[in-house]
């Protein structure tokens, strides 16, 4: 049943490329005070190369656990992967690159379609072109994330069985979708991204989210909690702001109720948590603290 539901979800994501070996070009290696930053160019999909950063601790003994960092949207198309290193005005400091490497994790971030060094076409144009040619923008973004996992596992300095994912907003959505579709993700942490698409329709909030996220026929076959149930029983933490209009409370409550039952049914009640912060669509000190603590516990 689980495998079939996962196949069904993949089928909704449009015509995806065949899985392929990942080629990488190292453009630069920069040694910073606390970590080492590799600037990379990854051929993840055979259509368009993805610029990436891999950041690792300076002092490690052997391969390290690693985190796939998913950047947010925020209408900041020039940012992309640089969010990992530079942060954003809605994220706390230190940057996730400094935070995570200080804890001993390696971190990979890629530019998703239309962001960072892959910008040039508008998001709406990419969405429409892909729709016309049998592809789904969200599906191609997910494909790149799954290929990024292939690359992470190929690195000799990464422990291939200790990979987690984290992201904020669009990045949080990508984190839980990637975890739902691939068991190689051992821990999932999402920030400000518990969006129930059925509740968005009900509350007339569809226009609060970009074109990138809309998958044809998704609402006919899956709810948000049904997708995320594919993560269970692996550890999953969702961090939400109670005043976040992009994640209506009705949807968050529904997802939490249903996933709590799923995890309990699999004997993993302690592996799923929802933490609410008295805030809007941004990271708070509470959110950062809980995210870091969860990663340290499970990864």
From Swiss-Prot:
GO terms for molecular function: serine-type endopeptidase activity. One of its GO terms (biological process) is proteolysis. It is an enzyme of class 3 (hydrolase). It comes from the Bacteria. Disulfide bonds: none annotated. Its EC number is 3.-.-.-. Pfam families: DLH. This is Putative hydrolase YtaP.
């Amino acid at each position: 049943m689980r495998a079939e539901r996962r196949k069904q979800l993949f089928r909704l994501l449009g015509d995806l490329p065949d899985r392929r070996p990942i080629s990488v070009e190292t453009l630069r290696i920069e040694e910073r005070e606390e970590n080492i930053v590799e600037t990379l160019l990854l051929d993840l999909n055979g259509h368009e190369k993805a610029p990436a950063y891999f950041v690792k601790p300076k002092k490690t003994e052997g391969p390290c656990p690693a985190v796939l960092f998913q950047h947010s949207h925020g209408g900041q198309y020039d940012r992309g992967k640089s969010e990992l290193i530079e942060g954003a005005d809605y994220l706390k400091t230190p940057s996730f690159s400094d935070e995570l490497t200080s804890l001993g994790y390696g971190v990979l971030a890629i530019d998703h379609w239309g962001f960072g060094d892959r910008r040039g076409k508008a998001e709406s144009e990419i969405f429409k072109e892909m729709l016309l040619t049998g592809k789904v923008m969200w599906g191609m973004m997910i494909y790149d994330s799954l290929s990024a996992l292939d690359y992470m596992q190929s690195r000799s300095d990464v422990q291939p069985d200790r990979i987690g994912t984290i992201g904020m907003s669009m990045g949080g959505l990508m984190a839980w979708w990637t975890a739902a579709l691939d068991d190689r993700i051992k821990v999932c942490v999402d920030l400000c991204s518990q969006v129930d698409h059925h509740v968005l329709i009900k509350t007339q909030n569809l226009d609060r989210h970009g074109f990138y996220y809309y998958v044809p026929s998704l609402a006919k076959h899956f709810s948000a909690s049904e997708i995320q149930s594919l993560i269970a029983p692996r550890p999953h933490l969702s961090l939400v702001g109670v005043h976040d209009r992009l994640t209506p409370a009705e949807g968050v409550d529904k997802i939490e109720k249903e996933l709590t039952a799923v995890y309990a049914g699999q004997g993993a009640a302690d592996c799923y948590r929802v933490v609410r912060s008295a805030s809007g669509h941004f990271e708070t000190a509470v959110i950062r603290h809980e995210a870091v603590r969860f990663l340290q516990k499970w990864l």
